[in-house]
């Protein structure tokens, strides 16, 4: 039989809801708090992500999703028309200037269309983009370096080196008319000097006449979404019949992904530990919200259980009772969720700038996200949590019989009652009361323990950040000094000079100092073909690799591979980490010992030991005065028409030197060439390299440590003044900078984690509050009876205080057990995610919460009982009926 009674059920829901306004306010507050938890979390996380992405984009030089490199006009047109490409912007670089005033931050001279200009943060705020002839637009800092006052129509003279696809050629000096400019962004990697298409085409035509290649045009694109950028771009190439992994195939369109997008970084580093961490965090948030609301509806059902029993006596079905509770929950959501959304978004928007101010990201890039995910996700999570939370109380109301309902006192009695002749003790009564509804007690204890466990985990997490590990990976010395070319990974004929090193040494107090040298002549180390194939396999297909190997010089199974040999003063050998062997032979005069520098992963492991020679092996190095490429078919020097597969290196003035591998070492990146390639990296003593290379060594860097903080501060001040200004030929790195970055990074986690702990702690306190309220509301009749037979208000209050203290101490004990169980597992997972994390077990935060919980366990019952005990015993008995 189908009875149309939905309207009646709806009226029952509304009327019963209206009859309990005070309790409804608590429920609305709980729903709003849950929504606030979700909204503030989503707002903070997405806003921090948006701000971090903006920071990364400015470091990269733009926010286009990716770049199709070196495209022809036809390829650009086809790619732009592909359905996956929302918008495209072309850029043609015609030259670069990296000397003189642009030595520290180079400038690129290029034509950009409107889209590319916008995506590269190069849209003029004053004036317009270049449109024809010798018009130019650039940032204000570049104008200042050139000695030009930012004023439209001003003449700007720029000298730059023409750059085609393969090389940097002759220098051009031209005077342009300034038609637009914008404020300089210090995070940008280069100064953009934008010229018109007409001028770019004219210069390209002149360059081609001199024998240069046509200039390279890159196509920046915005895709349908910022996820799986690599896969989307590869799909575009595949759909259009292009490949993307060859430098020489004319049908290959190489791709570059903007690593500023966190989604592209996440996809490349996605591992099971990270997935588990994210899933655990989301489950934690949902469970936290569940704990808030479940007790609220448990209170409602407990308070109205007699009402539901009466409804069942007049024919209301269990399904209808569930619907009544569910409708009440959804009606409360109509008020609580919007309030939580507004408050949560407001709190998140206020906290994001606070968090960013404590980090190196505080450079005007604060971005408050307005993503629909914040609001849609918060509403869905809140609704899911509410529906889950009211489902069990709904089942309880549906199952209760009218007779049971009249006797309901929030107890779940299953054990046989025992008589006692010792009399009732208040603490025993309180302890027994906790066992009357074990499920409620467990939920309250877990919710309180969860906040303490999270607080303890946060302290262990932040305390596990190893500054020593972090700083040592950033720099291996208190100070490293060289030229901008060195810090920008550019090869150069000269870096820091001996005279500059002497001046720095004379003005600083060093406990250890030394120079690292570069070899300026072509140098090669002979290695097995299998090892060299491993290197080239990262860049070439199997067919290309076979062709390449056939063009290299062989001696049996050995092949001549490129190398980077760095020479060190003897004092700097202490900076090497010896993994195998002994470096002491390198310190002996007239030695022929060499150390092979290996690459370790972030956790100090050697991933491919078979790639390197063994300690004790003899390895041959070949030094040459010059190297040229010939056509392997004719033996003559190659020409522009020679296909790359026939290029063959020919050495002039070559001489071999045999070395004995004395050790495998880790050479800190901060004192190395700072770039890698194919072939071995090796370390020799400065004297040995000078002897074997024919004197072709030049100082590359100077580093030193100081004895104490005072000497370090003096050196920092001196080097800061020495390298100040755009015209200074030197730059430096210091440990002080790395320490500051580490402190900012740590502070950010402290703030975000502290906010999360505060919210979850508030959840725990609310559940504590709700548990005590449940005990008082559902036991009003019991309390009135106890008072009627002689129990005083003071005794009742003391009993409730004991209950509060039992809750508090049980929560601390549960937090202690949870910390013991979860701590090592979380530490292992965090250690795999953060290479500079070292887990240290701690229980101090749990102990520090004991006084706080004891105070709350006493204070909350006192306040709540005083408020509830204002009525007389007769009134309480009447109300309880």
Predicted regions and their residues:
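Feature of multi-pass inner-membrane transport and sensor proteins
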Residues: 1-26, 303-320, 347-376, 384-448, ...
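Hydrophobic alpha-helical transmembrane signal-anchor segments
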Residues: 18, 23-46, 280, 287
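Hydrophobic transmembrane alpha-helices
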Residues: 34-35, 283-290, 384-385, 758-768, ...
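Basic-flanked hydrophobic alpha-helices used for secretion and membrane insertion
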Residues: 46-265, 463, 470-753
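Short helix-loop junctions at transmembrane helix boundaries
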Residues: 48, 270, 341-377, 391, ...
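Interfacial "coupling" helices/loops that link adjacent transmembrane helices in transporter permeases
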Residues: 20, 291-332, 764-807
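Selective transmembrane-helix segments that form parts of the transport pathway or gating/packing helices
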Residues: 325-342, 379, 414-419, 800-814
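N-terminal membrane-entry
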Residues: 268-285, 373, 743-760
């Amino acid at each position: 039989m189908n009875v149309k009674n939905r309207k009646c059920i709806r009226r029952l829901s509304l009327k019963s809801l209206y009859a309990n306004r005070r309790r409804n306010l608590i429920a609305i507050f709980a729903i709003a708090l849950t929504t606030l938890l979700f909204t503030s979390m989503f707002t903070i996380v997405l806003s921090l992500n948006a701000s971090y992405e903006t920071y990364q984009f400015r470091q990269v030089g733009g926010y286009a999703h990716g770049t199709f490199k070196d495209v022809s006009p036809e390829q650009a047109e086809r790619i732009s028309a592909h359905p996956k490409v929302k918008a495209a912007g072309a850029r043609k670089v015609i030259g670069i200037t990296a000397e003189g005033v642009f030595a520290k931050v180079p400038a690129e001279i290029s034509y950009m269309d409107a889209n590319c200009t916008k995506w590269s943060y190069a849209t003029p705020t004053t004036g317009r983009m270049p449109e024809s002839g010798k018009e130019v637009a650039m940032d204000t800092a570049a104008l200042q370096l050139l000695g030009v006052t930012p004023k439209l129509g001003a003449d700007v003279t720029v000298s730059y080196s023409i750059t085609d696809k393969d090389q940097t050629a002759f220098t051009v000096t031209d005077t342009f008319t300034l038609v637009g400019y914008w404020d300089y962004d210090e995070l940008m990697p280069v100064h953009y000097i934008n010229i018109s298409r007409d001028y770019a085409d004219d210069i390209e035509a002149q360059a081609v006449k001199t024998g240069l290649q046509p200039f390279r045009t890159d196509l920046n694109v915005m895709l349908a979404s910022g996820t799986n950028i690599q896969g989307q771009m590869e799909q575009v190439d595949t759909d259009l019949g292009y490949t993307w992994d060859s430098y020489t195939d004319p049908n290959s369109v190489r791709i570059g992904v903007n690593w500023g997008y966190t989604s592209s970084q996440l996809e490349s580093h996605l591992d099971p530990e990270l997935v588990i961490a994210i899933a655990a965090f989301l489950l934690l948030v949902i469970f936290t919200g569940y704990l808030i609301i479940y007790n609220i509806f448990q209170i409602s059902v407990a308070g109205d259980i007699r009402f539901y029993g009466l409804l069942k006596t007049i024919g209301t079905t269990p399904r209808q009772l569930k619907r009544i509770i569910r409708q009440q929950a959804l009606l409360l959501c109509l008020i609580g969720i919007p309030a939580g959304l507004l408050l949560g978004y407001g709190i998140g928007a206020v906290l994001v700038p606070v968090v960013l101010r404590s980090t190196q990201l505080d450079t005007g890039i604060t971005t408050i996200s307005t993503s629909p995910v914040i609001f849609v996700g918060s509403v869905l999570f809140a609704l899911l949590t509410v529906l889950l939370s009211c489902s069990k109380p709904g089942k309880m109301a549906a199952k209760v019989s009218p007779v049971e309902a009249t006797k309901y006192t929030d107890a779940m009695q299953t054990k046989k009652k025992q008589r006692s002749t010792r009399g009732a003790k208040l603490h025993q009564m309180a302890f027994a009361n906790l066992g009357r509804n074990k499920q409620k007690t467990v939920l309250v204890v877990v919710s309180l323990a969860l906040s303490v466990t999270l607080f303890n985990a946060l302290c262990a997490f932040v305390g596990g950040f190893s500054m020593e590990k972090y700083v040592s990976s950033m720099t291996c010395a208190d100070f490293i000094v060289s030229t901008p070319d060195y810090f920008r990974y550019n090869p150069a004929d000269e870096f820091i000079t001996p005279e500059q090193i002497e001046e720095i040494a004379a003005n600083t107090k060093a406990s250890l100092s030394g120079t690292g040298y570069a070899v300026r002549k072509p140098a090669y180390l002979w290695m097995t073909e299998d090892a060299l194939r491993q290197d080239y396999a990262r860049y070439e297909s199997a067919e290309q690799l076979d062709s390449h190997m056939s063009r290299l010089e062989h001696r049996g199974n050995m092949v001549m591979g490129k190398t980077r040999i760095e020479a060190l003063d003897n004092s700097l050998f202490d900076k090497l980490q010896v993994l195998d062997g002994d470096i002491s032979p390198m310190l002996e005069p007239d030695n022929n010992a060499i150390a092979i520098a290996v690459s370790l992963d972030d956790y100090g492991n050697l991933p491919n030991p078979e790639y390197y020679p063994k300690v004790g092996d003899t390895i041959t190095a070949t030094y040459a005065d010059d190297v040229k490429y010939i056509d392997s078919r004719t033996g003559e020097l190659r020409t522009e028409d020679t296909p790359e597969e026939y290029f063959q290196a020919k050495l002039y003035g070559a001489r071999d030197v045999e070395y004995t591998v004395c050790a495998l070492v880790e050479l800190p990146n901060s004192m190395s060439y700072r770039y890698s390639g194919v072939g071995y990296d090796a370390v020799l003593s400065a004297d040995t390299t000078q002897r074997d290379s024919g004197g072709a060594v030049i100082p590359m860097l100077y580093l030193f440590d100081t004895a104490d903080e005072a000497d370090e501060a003096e050196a920092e001040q001196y080097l800061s003044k020495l390298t100040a200004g755009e015209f200074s030929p030197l730059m430096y790195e210091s440990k002080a900078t790395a320490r500051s970055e580490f402190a900012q990074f740590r502070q950010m986690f402290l703030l975000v984690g502290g906010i999360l702990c505060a919210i979850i702690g508030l959840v725990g306190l609310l559940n504590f509050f709700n548990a005590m309220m449940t005990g008082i509301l559902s036991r009003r009749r019991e309390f009135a009876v106890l008072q009627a037979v002689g129990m005083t208000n003071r005794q009742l209050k003391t009993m409730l205080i004991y209950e509060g203290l039992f809750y508090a101490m049980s929560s601390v004990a549960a937090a202690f057990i949870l910390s013991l169980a979860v701590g090592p597992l979380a530490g292992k997972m965090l250690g795999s995610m953060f290479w500079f994390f070292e887990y240290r077990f701690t229980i101090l935060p749990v102990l520090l919460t004991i006084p706080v919980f004891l105070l709350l366990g006493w204070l909350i019952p006192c306040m709540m009982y005083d408020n509830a005990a204002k009525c007389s015993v007769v009134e309480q008995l009447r109300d309880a009926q």
